[in-house]
Amino acid sequence: MKVKETNSKPKLASRGTFQRKGIKIVGKWKQVTIDPNLFADGQMDDLVCFEELTDYRLVKNPSRLFSSEETKKRKAQAVSEEEEEEEGQSSSPKKKIKLKKQRDAARAAEGAAAQNEYEVKASEPEAQGEVTACSDQKVGGAKSESLAQAAPRKKKNKGKKKLDTFQSTSPKLPKKSKKTWMAEVHDQKADVSAWRDLFVPKAVLRALSFLGFSAPTPIQALTLAPAIRDKLDILGAAETGSGKTLAFAIPMIHSVLQWHKMKAPPIPRSTGMPPREMRFGATAHLGSPCKDRTESGVLPEEARIETEAQPSDSGVQATPETSASASAQTLLVCDDDAGEGPSSLEEKPVPKQNEDGEEKFDAEQAGKLKQELCDQIAIYKVHPRRPLLGLVLTPTRELAIQVRQHIDAVAKFTGINTAILVGGMSTQKQQRMLNRHPEIVIATPGRLWELVKEKHPHLSNLRQLRCLVIDEADRMVEKGHFAELSQLLEMLNDSQYNPSRQTLVFSATLTLVHQAPARILHKKHVKKMDKTDKLDLLMQKVGMRGKPKVIDLTRNEGTVETLTETKIHCETDEKDLYLYYFLMQYPGRSLVFANSISCIKRLSGLLKVLDVMPLTLHACMHQKQRLRNLEQFARLQDCVLLATDVAARGLDIPKVQHVIHYQVPRTSEIYIHRSGRTARAASEGLSLMLIGPEDVINFKKIYKTLQKDEDIPLFPVQSKYMDVVKERIRLARQIEKAEYRNFQACLHNSWIEQAAAALEIELEEEMYKGGKADQQEERRRQKQMKMLKQELRHLLSQPLFQENLKTRYPTQSGRPPQPVLASRNIESALSCLSRQKRRRKKPKEPRAPPQPGSSTS
């Protein structure tokens, strides 16, 4: 039996071209009888005969498939010729001959090893559903034919051979890492003994050691034991950056591993296969590498083996040779887009080769191999396809992507497959991901409900769902938001209800209760809601039945202890001044929040004119651009990200130093989540609020809800630099307004002209936005813009923070002293604020009372 190799991941054909394929003939051509009456008209006189072929295979890269033996023979002949030439050349140096012989011997050894290697690699099928199959060249003594013939022999080029050897010795380029805004982690080999009492699976412990998580956080320590051991529903509330993702990811992974362990089929003893080939449910919890993909108790769908019985065209009885060749026609088929699976035919007896290089099997070896294949097929067919076992729902797309990356990192050595379903991305690609039958799906409610309504097979039966997670649940169940979530929860609790399903609900503001608006409190029969009422309402909306375990680790203030809060009172027009001053005085990774997209766009244009070059993130952006901006913001050390509340919840961006509230949030929950983007994982951070006259009401509500004991300190601002900042902001506003007005006018006028051309009508000047300007007016406007930009460019070229030296005496050169740049990088915003606090806390020294009898003149 001889099995050919094909590429595991063939390149897709380019658009507009056809991929070359060949036909592997397995059976024989049959003559088709034709009715003689069809030849009466004389239109088919040129037809000689008509034959059909029913037993064949479509193969890719046929020249490589059928000419491998010839290439091996040519290589062997070339090696022997080179050896003869080397023996005949006695005048060459001995050292060169020795090195060349060693190199040729190594090549010959590699060629022999490649011939003796007996390994099956399943190639990835095309989207059209064609199967790449490998079979023997001889079937029933008939030699197979192909449309693609072997390439003709060519003379060897020594220069090309040298180039090939150089390419083989050159180091390979490193693989591109996955795009993510999270910090890259290498193998930390941390001590995970603190996790052992929390019933964490061994495979997860290995991943935690790899990630460097030596000890659990408080929310993890209190959640894992009741969730894994007692299988209780959890309502968890903890501060931002406290590790809530792992608190629900580890119980979900444990639940999936337990399902695989229960569903694993028993190991048959009659197979005679090596123990290494039959690693099943007994090693599901040992945490072997994920490349074997067998720790979860069953081999993956990618390694599923299917056989097809080949029909015999002739009536000749099967000989041992034909039976061996028939067994060689067993197909190893992969699921669509599933990649390579583990080879199930490793360490088998190598078939003997005759002088012509053709492989022959004994009848005994063929029988053993066929029996082993049949046993494996029986095992795989006993196990059903993997259902959906874990579902995670998140409010934003970026948070869903981040949760998926966290789960993949923890499930690194478990072999569990995950998929993500979010809007803004290709629906067809996500459907193909679901076709792989992942055990865990992370999704936003909109796209998930869309695929559920389309009745995707993997989402059609949710009764086997073992774990449901709702992250940021207080936002998800708010009235007027996520209408698809209510329909999804209703389906899960009614027609797709599973009584053994575990529900985990987490949020940083799960138990925070803010005061309702006055218009609602003035109504009749309105009861003030407390923490218990809020949790009961949440349990009712989610559909929790029974009494869950409530874990509340939040403080009354809502924010973490390592967060420093400060504020600046200013007019609305002065917010741009203080924002630009802060960004220039204290550089670093700063995240600026606003309440509206229009404000984000205006700030972006203003800061770009001032050469700050910020990044933006809001709901009207394309999803790929949103992810690209997040990755760039996490990569750069000195960068500004302007974002709406899309980026307020859950995002774990490393080393964010400052969070600036350009507009005060409307609720205290949003303020807590915004401020939680910094000061994560016991690190320090700064939260700055720019409070205008219209923000005072919202600020007082937040201050009252969070029960602040002391007033939020004012941020120190050096007023001596504000005059230069005001001049820069004035020029930048004029330029930004003029450019925005010109852009809107051009956009409107171009649309009007296109519509008029389509309707074949003439336009009047009043229909143009701002009137149809003549050339003289346009030149005057451009000249004015050029002057403003030159003036601003001159101001930007001057240092903003400088100290003017004052002296009472003339200098030696007779010129005024040069200004000295202020050392703005020495002191950070946190150190400046702490220094101001220390000054305020210093007690004033009491003045000594005047002594009696002393007089003042």
UniProtKB/Swiss-Prot annotation:
<keyword id="KW-1017">Isopeptide bond</keyword>
<feature type="domain" description="Helicase C-terminal">
    <location>
        <begin position="576"/>
        <end position="723"/>
    </location>
</feature>
<feature type="cross-link" description="Glycyl lysine isopeptide (Lys-Gly) (interchain with G-Cter in SUMO2)">
    <location>
        <position position="370"/>
    </location>
</feature>
<dbReference type="GO" id="GO:0016887">
    <property type="term" value="F:ATP hydrolysis activity"/>
</dbReference>
<feature type="modified residue" description="Phosphoserine">
    <location>
        <position position="80"/>
    </location>
</feature>
<dbReference type="GO" id="GO:0003723">
    <property type="term" value="F:RNA binding"/>
</dbReference>
<feature type="compositionally biased region" description="Polar residues">
    <location>
        <begin position="309"/>
        <end position="330"/>
    </location>
</feature>
<feature type="short sequence motif" description="Q motif">
    <location>
        <begin position="193"/>
        <end position="221"/>
    </location>
</feature>
<feature type="modified residue" description="Phosphoserine">
    <location>
        <position position="92"/>
    </location>
</feature>
<feature type="compositionally biased region" description="Pro residues">
    <location>
        <begin position="848"/>
        <end position="857"/>
    </location>
</feature>
<keyword id="KW-0597">Phosphoprotein</keyword>
<keyword id="KW-0832">Ubl conjugation</keyword>
<feature type="region of interest" description="Disordered">
    <location>
        <begin position="61"/>
        <end position="179"/>
    </location>
</feature>
<comment type="function">
    <text>ATP-dependent RNA helicase that plays a role in various aspects of RNA metabolism including pre-mRNA splicing and is thereby involved in different biological processes such as cell cycle regulation or innate immunity. Plays an inhibitory role in TP53 transcriptional activity and subsequently in TP53 controlled cell growth arrest and senescence by inhibiting its EP300 mediated acetylation. Negatively regulates cytosolic RNA-mediated innate immune signaling at least in part by affecting RIPK1/IRF7 interactions.</text>
</comment>
<feature type="domain" description="Helicase ATP-binding">
    <location>
        <begin position="225"/>
        <end position="528"/>
    </location>
</feature>
<dbReference type="GO" id="GO:0005634">
    <property type="term" value="C:nucleus"/>
</dbReference>
<feature type="cross-link" description="Glycyl lysine isopeptide (Lys-Gly) (interchain with G-Cter in SUMO2)">
    <location>
        <position position="624"/>
    </location>
</feature>
<keyword id="KW-0378">Hydrolase</keyword>
<feature type="compositionally biased region" description="Basic residues">
    <location>
        <begin position="835"/>
        <end position="844"/>
    </location>
</feature>
<dbReference type="InterPro" id="IPR000629">
    <property type="entry name" value="RNA-helicase_DEAD-box_CS"/>
</dbReference>
<dbReference type="GO" id="GO:0003724">
    <property type="term" value="F:RNA helicase activity"/>
</dbReference>
<keyword id="KW-0694">RNA-binding</keyword>
<comment type="subunit">
    <text>Interacts with FADD. Interacts with RIPK1; this interaction disrupts RLR signaling activation of IFN-dependent transcription factor IRF7. Interacts with NIP7. Interacts with EP300; this interaction prevents TP53 acetylation mediated by EP300.</text>
</comment>
<feature type="compositionally biased region" description="Basic and acidic residues">
    <location>
        <begin position="290"/>
        <end position="307"/>
    </location>
</feature>
<dbReference type="InterPro" id="IPR011545">
    <property type="entry name" value="DEAD/DEAH_box_helicase_dom"/>
</dbReference>
<feature type="compositionally biased region" description="Basic residues">
    <location>
        <begin position="152"/>
        <end position="161"/>
    </location>
</feature>
<dbReference type="Pfam" id="PF00271">
    <property type="entry name" value="Helicase_C"/>
</dbReference>
<feature type="binding site">
    <location>
        <begin position="238"/>
        <end position="245"/>
    </location>
    <ligand>
        <name>ATP</name>
    </ligand>
</feature>
<feature type="modified residue" description="Phosphoserine">
    <location>
        <position position="170"/>
    </location>
</feature>
<dbReference type="InterPro" id="IPR001650">
    <property type="entry name" value="Helicase_C-like"/>
</dbReference>
<feature type="compositionally biased region" description="Polar residues">
    <location>
        <begin position="825"/>
        <end position="834"/>
    </location>
</feature>
<keyword id="KW-0547">Nucleotide-binding</keyword>
<feature type="modified residue" description="Phosphoserine">
    <location>
        <position position="288"/>
    </location>
</feature>
<feature type="short sequence motif" description="DEAD box">
    <location>
        <begin position="471"/>
        <end position="474"/>
    </location>
</feature>
<dbReference type="Pfam" id="PF00270">
    <property type="entry name" value="DEAD"/>
</dbReference>
<protein>
    <recommendedName>
        <fullName>ATP-dependent RNA helicase DDX24</fullName>
        <ecNumber>3.6.4.13</ecNumber>
    </recommendedName>
</protein>
<feature type="region of interest" description="Disordered">
    <location>
        <begin position="279"/>
        <end position="363"/>
    </location>
</feature>
<dbReference type="GO" id="GO:0005737">
    <property type="term" value="C:cytoplasm"/>
</dbReference>
<keyword id="KW-0067">ATP-binding</keyword>
<comment type="similarity">
    <text>Belongs to the DEAD box helicase family. DDX24/MAK5 subfamily.</text>
</comment>
<dbReference type="GO" id="GO:0005524">
    <property type="term" value="F:ATP binding"/>
</dbReference>
<keyword id="KW-0963">Cytoplasm</keyword>
